[in-house]
From Swiss-Prot:
Keywords: Acetylation, Phosphoprotein, Ribonucleoprotein, Ribosomal protein
Protein name: Large ribosomal subunit protein P2
Gene name of this polypeptide: RPLP2
GO cellular component: cytoplasm; cytosol; cytosolic large ribosomal subunit; extracellular exosome; focal adhesion; membrane
One Gene Ontology MF term: structural constituent of ribosome
Phylogenetic classification of the source organism: Eukaryota, Metazoa, Chordata, Craniata, Vertebrata
Length: 115
């Protein structure tokens, strides 16, 4: 990621085709040593490409990656129907859980395990 960021920084700074020397200079300015193999890989992949197009393609690829929230949303409607009939029981369980939590917090007498 550091090599891509340095390449983009050089390209956005006006250098349309940054070399390995340019990127090493950027990395050295913040105290990062460059790995020549990775650096050459980034340069070979990005050399000659329009940076704005590369960023737009990356955003498109990230948008197609599924997010973790979609699974929970799809499961909720199927489980909502059975839960509607047992709402009072669920409320009682929640009250019991709250009581148990308060008892557990008193067990340590206000002191945490690692304090």
């Amino acid at each position: 990621m550091r090599y891509v960021a340095s390449y983009l920084l050089a390209a956005l700074g006006g250098n349309s085709s940054p070399s390995a020397k340019d990127i090493k200079k950027i990395l050295d300015s913040v105290g990062i040593e460059a790995d020549d193999d990775r650096l050459n890989k980034v340069i070979s992949e990005l050399n000659g490409k329009n940076i704005e197009d590369v960023i737009a393609q990356g955003i498109g690829k990230l948008a197609s990656v599924p997010a973790g929230g979609a699974v929970a949303v799809s499961a909720a409607p199927g489980s909502a129907a059975p839960a509607a009939g047992s709402a009072p029981a669920a409320a009682e369980e929640k009250k019991d859980e709250k009581k148990e939590e308060s008892e557990e917090s008193d067990d340590d007498m206000g002191f945490g395990l690692f304090d």
